[in-house]
UniProtKB/Swiss-Prot annotation:
Organism encoding this protein: Propioniciclava tarda
GO molecular function: lyase activity; metal ion binding; nucleotide binding
Enzyme nomenclature, EC number: 4.6.1.2, 4.6.1.26
Name assigned to this protein: Uridylate cyclase
GO CC terms of this entry: cytoplasm
Length: 308
């Protein structure tokens, strides 16, 4: 047997033993932390401890068509596009106080927990969507021909998660924080399902936001506040029971956006909304609830017919 064969055989044998040890004998400790937990305190690979955070809001941004952005351009031009786009999104996460930021190729994600995590996350998501449109306008001016359709797609989800740094011990460059749970996974699937300049948030997040008038209703510009700012959407990439979501197509209003963002971040929730508009959104909620009940009843009846 050659040295290469011996190396591979030994490596696979060692990996198998390590997996068996971790699955059956390795001590694992889970510590629940509150909103004051700091990302720099995430346990290292040498620790047996995982940290559990009861609720983390993940905002994932994904740049549409990024694989084609370098086609026909010089390396320096491609680098400028990535630098300006990705750094712009990362700065948004930073400015809205993301507790953890991870850059992944043409995008990344920000994680929010603690005080007003949902509000900070939503404002960050809408701001990235707004930045996306302005970013693309600048790209189109710089390269009026041959630019692929691009722009940020944003997804948001919230749930509990476990976190720990995993990788090669004593090799910092080979270690990363692993977020085990649904927040990043679901938010990424929402972003993948969105089109450019869209924000998709899961029903779990919308349930926390729908009673905030600064979020649920459009601003007073034009025809005044309306209840059609968000529309229902189904995220087929998610498990069937979690596919309900809503999508936002609009950026921050140039006139009202700064004040609305400030109000949301300050925890304000109520505006002077005409009763007819408020009744309209309540009617839509009722129609959605009735439709969901109809689907549940239909599924239950089909199941009963199947066992007769």
């Amino acid at each position: 047997m050659s040295d290469e064969d011996l190396f591979l055989t030994a490596l696979l044998d060692s990996l198998g033993k390590e997996v068996n040890t971790v699955l059956n004998n390795s001590p694992i400790k889970v510590e629940e932390k509150d909103g004051d937990f700091k990302a720099e305190d995430i346990p290292s690979p040498s620790s047996d401890t995982w940290v559990k955070l009861p609720e983390v809001v993940a905002v994932v941004c994904d740049l549409k068509g990024s694989t084609h952005l370098g086609t026909g351009k010089h390396d320096t031009s491609t680098a400028r596009i990535y630098k300006s786009g990705v750094e712009g999104a990362v700065r948004v996460f930073h400015e809205f106080g993301a507790n953890f930021i991870d850059i992944q190729g043409d995008g990344g994600f920000g994680l929010f927990w603690g005080e007003r995590a949902h509000e900070r996350a939503l404002c960050a998501g809408v701001t990235i969507r707004t930045f996306s449109e302005e970013f693309v306008e600048r790209l189109e001016k710089r390269w009026p021909e041959g630019l692929p359709e691009t722009g940020y797609k944003v997804g948001i989800h919230a749930a509990r998660t476990l976190v720990k740094r995993i990788g090669t011990k004593r090799e910092i460059s080979e270690q990363e924080a692993v977020w085990a749970g649904r927040p990043v996974n679901y938010a990424a699937k929402c972003a993948q399902s969105a089109d450019r300049h869209q924000v998709i948030i899961t029903q779990a997040v919308w349930d926390k936001m729908k009673d905030n008038d600064f979020i649920a209703f459009s601003c007073d510009c034009g025809d005044g506040p309306t209840a059609n700012l968000w529309t229902d959407v189904t995220v087929d990439r998610l498990p069937e029971e979690d596919r309900d979501a809503v999508v936002l197509n609009s950026p921050w209003c140039k006139t009202c956006g700064p004040a609305f963002c400030e109000a949301i971040m300050a925890g304000e929730k109520k505006r002077d909304i005409p009763s007819a508009v408020r009744t309209g959104i309540n009617r839509m909620k009722m129609q959605k609830a009735l439709e969901a009940k109809r689907l549940r009843d239909s599924s239950r009846n089909s199941a009963l017919r199947g066992v007769r």
